[in-house]
């Protein structure tokens, strides 16, 4: 045996494989205020003990690998390793449990959601000892969240920019989402904004296709919103989608939007990536642009109960990366979203301090300190009959977005916008008068139809439309 090898042995190095739980399962550990905490739903392979599976998650998402390495002796493993500090059973699920893992703050680069996710969810989800793994929640300590800019402006600054208070904001996604020329697209934008909406929106997959290049769309939409502003006396906006194939092209589109003087741009933050999104958010704050965020691709990640990542984690990540709006489900429309769960992550988007509440899926108390909030956007299969429920569920600090529920009006786009604006104003007035929208909502809408033929026509068209399917993701 060489002297060098003897030296390794003398400091305790022993080659081979040992159980993760011997190093990474530490039920006696007391979490620190600076730790990033994670709650994983773990489904181990048959024969793998819960402690070993939880420890494996902690190891493979922090400092561990499959075998002992002698370079462990060159650092302080106790300082840098993740620790599985608690395990609890999942009620009604014999083969699942929640593993709580604490990560030291020094494992993560400051101000980088990309690095945070690369570490915590980047590799461990393919681990063979696990049948399935889902990240249910993260606790982001102020010591880490303060390294992020967060939303470019936030809720209060947006209201001040728009001079609109005391009600939800109204939007509309232009349909058909693909195939319109830039001029016809701009026409639809103008008609919707003139009819009473606050915003119109590019759909998530409208970028720069052969039928409508981005620069043409930006110019016609800017012309449309300025014309609508002049005619209505209200500040209007259109979410110009700056998402592109490269960060450089994305920034070029955002710069052109700023030169046009429009108030807001848009980004698909999951398909575009967190690095690109954070860069765009920084540009938007520096240049006075609001930033609307679409969550295209989220259901690939978050829809299955046993594997992936819950949207509340993606919502927290977006608040750190930066966005002033984000789509958050509707509860009542065509897209997935259970009420208590949805309201849980809506609070995580908007509020400064959110208490732990397992009944709403919130595993940790979250303190955002001074980070601005994000407006949740309710969009997808909603129409005027949903307005009372949406107003009651989401409150004033939200954006209610009707695509087909505006453009599908039998009289055209502008009457569709009028119908939605009248319905919203009626619901807000009824709520302010003390009426119970959950119980009296339909009556409130019927009363408003007496004064608005546009609303009456909309109510007739969509009176039988419902999306009644069981939610997949429930508590």
From Swiss-Prot:
Keywords: Acetylation, Calvin cycle, Carbon dioxide fixation, Chloroplast, Disulfide bond, Lyase, Magnesium, Metal-binding, Methylation, Monooxygenase, Oxidoreductase, Photorespiration, Photosynthesis, Plastid. GO terms for biological process: photorespiration; reductive pentose-phosphate cycle. One of its GO terms (cellular component) is chloroplast. It comes from the Eukaryota. The record marks 334 as: Transition state stabilizer. The modification N-acetylproline is found at residue 3. The modification N6,N6,N6-trimethyllysine is found at residue 14. The keyword Kinase does not apply. Substrate binds at residues 123, 173, 177, 295, 327, 379. Binds 1 Mg(2+) ion per subunit. PROSITE patterns: RUBISCO_LARGE. It is found in: Plastid, Chloroplast. The modification N6-carboxylysine is found at residue 201. The disulfide bond which can form in the large chain dimeric partners within the hexadecamer appears to be associated with oxidative stress and protein turnover. GO terms for molecular function: magnesium ion binding; monooxygenase activity; ribulose-bisphosphate carboxylase activity. Its EC number is 4.1.1.39. Mg(2+) binds at residues 201, 203-204. PANTHER family: RIBULOSE BISPHOSPHATE CARBOXYLASE (PTHR42704), RIBULOSE BISPHOSPHATE CARBOXYLASE LARGE CHAIN (PTHR42704:SF17). The basic functional RuBisCO is composed of a large chain homodimer in a 'head-to-tail' conformation. In form I RuBisCO this homodimer is arranged in a barrel-like tetramer with the small subunits forming a tetrameric 'cap' on each end of the 'barrel'. Belongs to the RuBisCO large chain family. Type I subfamily. RuBisCO catalyzes two reactions: the carboxylation of D-ribulose 1,5-bisphosphate, the primary event in carbon dioxide fixation, as well as the oxidative fragmentation of the pentose substrate in the photorespiration process. Both reactions occur simultaneously and in competition at the same active site. This is Ribulose bisphosphate carboxylase large chain. The lineage of its organism: Eukaryota, Viridiplantae, Streptophyta, Embryophyta, Tracheophyta. The gene is rbcL.
